[in-house]
């Protein structure tokens, strides 16, 4: 859980921020229409939270219980990872992944809109 959150939180969000910072410099005389960007921001962050809490955290908890009861080798075994309850938890990751993906698609749509003009509004 910590690795997924830290990797995306630090490098993914930092990369998105850097892209937006550079794009802001390309259009210094105009303001962005931030509604689409706000939706992208919230969908990406809520999707990451749902993915972590709804899927990755339960996997870690079940693996910890299995490791305490039967050893680390058992918690990392194919039999444990392919068990029915782990399959269900793996499918529970889909809602968070979809939110994250929709947020990223909105971000791409916003960036395309910067080039075509629909994501910009004239400076007042």
Regions found by a protein language model. Name each.
Residues 10, 37-47, 93-103:
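Hydrophobic alpha-helical transmembrane segments of polytopic
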Residues 1-10:
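Transmembrane alpha-helix entry/boundary detector in multi-pass membrane proteins
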Residues 47-53:
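Aromatic-anchored segments of alpha-helical transmembrane domains
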Residues 1, 14-42, 53-91, 106-124:
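Juxtamembrane membrane-water interface segments of multi-pass membrane proteins
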């Amino acid at each position: 859980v910590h690795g997924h959150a830290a990797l995306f939180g630090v490098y993914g969000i930092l990369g998105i921020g850097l892209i937006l910072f550079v794009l802001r410099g390309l259009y210094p005389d105009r303001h962005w229409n931030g509604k689409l960007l706000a939706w992208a921001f919230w969908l990406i962050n809520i999707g990451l939270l749902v993915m972590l809490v709804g899927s990755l955290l339960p996997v870690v908890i079940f693996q910890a219980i299995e490791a305490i009861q039967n050893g680390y080798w058992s918690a990392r075994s194919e039999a444990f990872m392919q068990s029915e309850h782990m399959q269900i938890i793996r499918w529970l990751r889909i809602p968070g992944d979809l939110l994250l993906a929709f947020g990223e698609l909105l971000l791409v749509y916003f960036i395309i809109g910067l080039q075509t003009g629909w994501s910009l509004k004239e400076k007042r």
